A protein has these predicted regions:
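Conserved anion-binding
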Residues: 1-88
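Conserved, mostly hydrophobic/aromatic
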Residues: 47, 72, 92, 103, ...
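Active-site catalytic pocket residues across diverse enzymes, especially alpha/beta-hydrolases
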Residues: 76, 80, 121, 135
Length: 137
C-alpha cells in the first residue's frame, strides 16, 4: 500500500506489482481527490481512505471523507459486478465505538482501529468487541 502522492509514477508501480503477482493498494489522504484513484481502481486490491491526517495517533475522525468512501464503494461494486477485481475498501483514522457503525454504513470492508482500542473505557478486547459489534449492526 502506498500513498499516491509519494510515488512519481503510481500507475507504473501498480502495474509492476501486479505483473509480479504482488497485491497492491493505494492510500488516499483526506485532501486527496477520489478521482486520483479511479483510473487505476480496477488494478488495485485495496484502497485505503485516511479519515485523519496521517502521521500521529489519536487524532479526531474527519467525517468529510464520507463522500469519498461512498464514491469508491459505488465504483468498486460496479467493477465487481462487471467481473472486475474484488478491490477491498478500507478506512483508517479515528475509528472508535461511536463512529464504527457510521463507517460500516458507508460501505467499508475493513476499518483500522488504533487508539479506539486503547483507552480508559475498557480493556483492548472489550473495546474491540464493542467496535466489532457496532460495525455488524
Amino acid at each position: 500500500i502506498a500513498h499516491i502522492e509519494a510515488v512519481e509514477d503510481f500507475p507504473g508501480l501498480i502495474s509492476s506489482l501486479n505483473n509480479s503477482s504482488i497485491l497492491s493498494g493505494c492510500v488516499l489522504n483526506p485532501d486527496t481527490p477520489v478521482e486520483d484513484a479511479l483510473p487505476i481502481l480496477n488494478d488495485l486490491d485495496l484502497v485505503l481512505v485516511m479519515s485523519v491526517v496521517p502521521g500521529k495517533g489519536g487524532q479526531s475522525f474527519i467525517p468529510e471523507v464520507e463522500e469519498k468512501v461512498r464514491i469508491l464503494r459505488k465504483e468498486i461494486d460496479m467493477q465487481i459486478g462487471n467481473g472486475g477485481r474484488k478491490t477491498k475498501l478500507m478506512i483508517d483514522g479515528g475509528i472508535k465505538n461511536h463512529n464504527a457503525k457510521l463507517v460500516a454504513d458507508w460501505g467499508v470492508d475493513i476499518a483500522v482501529v488504533g487508539s479506539g482500542l486503547i483507552n480508559n473505557k475498557g480493556t483492548i478486547s472489550e473495546n474491540l468487541e464493542s467496535i466489532t459489534s457496532a460495525m455488524e449492526t
